[in-house]
Amino acid sequence: IRAKIFLCFLVPILFLILVGVFSYKKAAAGMYDTFRDSNEQTINMANQYLDVSNSFIEAEALKYAFQSDLGKYMIGLYETDAVQRKTVINSVGSSIRASQAGNDFISNIHIVTEEDVQMLSTKAGGTVMGIYKDYKNEMLGYSDNGKKIPEWVDYHNTLDDTLGLKQSDYIMAYQTTPQSGKGFIVIDVKASAIQQFLDSLDMGDGSIIGFVTQSGREIISEKLPDGQESTRADGETVFYGQDFFNNLEDQQTTKEVSINGKSYLFFYSRMERTNAAVCALVPMEIVNGQADDIRNVTIAVVLIACVVAVLIGIIISTGIQKNMKRISGRLEEVAEGNLTTKVSVKGHDEFNTVSYTHLRAHETLANL
């Protein structure tokens, strides 16, 4: 009887386990999709925000490219007119400083002129003459075909050496030529502004968010738990050069990757304007964290249900066994001829009815 009772309790428990497993899988799948979609939106919005910021930088550069007086100054037409030359220098100098102050993403603005013409820049320093030819030759080296100078570049070493610029101050630069065709307006994108923006994004403890340029320069923001320090070495790339990053053709990608034996969800969104990308690595333990909580609760509920069912089964089966022993024991006494015995059972169930029926039968037999 005890085994049958346990079996009766076991069947609903098995169904409870199946319901728990099904619920966990559905919850895990739903939370995974929700988490993935939410973070894809975060990365895409970050991409769009930075892309819009870059469009403002392009517009700022084009503003100077179409200034007639500046174009004439850059090719040396005002070198014989000291008054006009000074007027242009002061006017453009004030204007580029105002542009720098008005846009948090602008590090510096440089006006690269012909060799015999003074350059203009927001970078403080003395009088520096133009480096147009050397600068152009460097930029042609970055060109895909050796002819067309790229608009967005990650480095301008010639300009850095000439003006004493630090490459850590900018992450990339936009450049365009004036209407005259000689000279460059160069605007550096401030690395610290992008770093601050990436730091404002929150994708969970242990996640890594990065801005990666076309040639592999990176700005990385690590979301470390309290008290934990970064193990990344200075200059070490997180995304560029990795197998999961190389040869990505789609503009947007999300996939699971493994790094040093640890699973991550990789998000990637590339900008059309600059070919730079916003990327993120989110530990899978964060992705599945809430679903794991549901799994743990389900396991706990099932275990408690099993324990309660076993205890109830033991109590019921024990009561049945005791009553069965009392009844069978008294029946054996009657069978041996003892008509004075009485059957007494505990409870108000069917065994009590059996006991009463046995008592009536016993009394009738005794009267006979």
Residue ranges of predicted features:
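Solvent-exposed, extracytoplasmic
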Residues: 91-101, 180, 184-227
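Cytoplasm-proximal transmembrane signaling helix
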Residues: 211, 273, 277-335, 342-343
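Extracytoplasmic/periplasmic ligand-binding sensor regions of membrane-associated signaling proteins
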Residues: 100-108, 113-191, 197-200
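Extreme N-terminal signal-anchor transmembrane helix of membrane signaling/transducer proteins, especially
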Residues: 1-29, 33, 37
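Short, hydrophobic beta-strand elements of compact beta-sandwich sensory domains
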Residues: 176, 181-191, 264-291, 295
